[in-house]
Amino acid sequence: MALSTFLFDLDGTLIDSIELILRSYRHTMRAHRGLEPPDEVWMKGLGTPLSVQFRHWTDDPAEIEAMVATYRAYNLEHHDALVRPYDGVVVAVRALRHQGKTLGLVTSKMRSGALRGLQVAGLDDAFDVIVGSDEVTNPKPHPEPVLKALERLGAPATGAVFIGDSRHDIECGQAAGVKTAAVLWGPFDRAHLADLEPDYWLERPEDLAALG
């Protein structure tokens, strides 16, 4: 069956925000813990909500809330200067839309943060639906975000593909019963995702055209 519904992750897939994410993490850890852990610790949780990632450091809900607030304040201040779309992404996404494909965004960011990223990338009008972490009970890798996007679109899982860069994206898509496509222009390489056996590997944004 031809693919008609294309669901995208945001960070590491459409926009290169990795440096901003890591700077925000380092700033938060210095402010709340007086230390700067290796970036690899944070990268393991990339693609999950902030509240989930900060549980690595504390179980105190009040402290987690404070850490999230510190992170978001720094992230917002530096967002527009450090975020850009990956080369070729805007053209590839708009080509799919021109072909009549249904497009959705499924992100672990809050909806407001996702909209900010799309605006910087020039893609704020490209998607038929956006599902943020503040709109679901169970974030990625749980299937709920993808299932909610499909529900809002009135689209079946057959004919749908979820495109992302992280293990959480691939696991989410597989659990939701859609095809999965792993992008290799983001922070993770093929070896990091190979055991999950995504349906498609995308070396560059131009490869999206072959899925349509």
What label would you give each PLM region?
Residues 2-94, 99:
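N-terminal helical cap/lid subdomain that shapes the substrate entry/recognition surface
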Residues 1-4, 97, 111, 115-212:
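Asp-based, Mg2+/Mn2+-dependent phosphohydrolase catalytic module
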Residues 13, 107-109:
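Conserved phosphate-coupling serine/threonine residues in phosphotransfer and NTP-handling enzymes
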Residues 85, 106, 138:
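Residue-level marker of regulatory loop/turn positions in helix-turn-helix DNA-binding domains and
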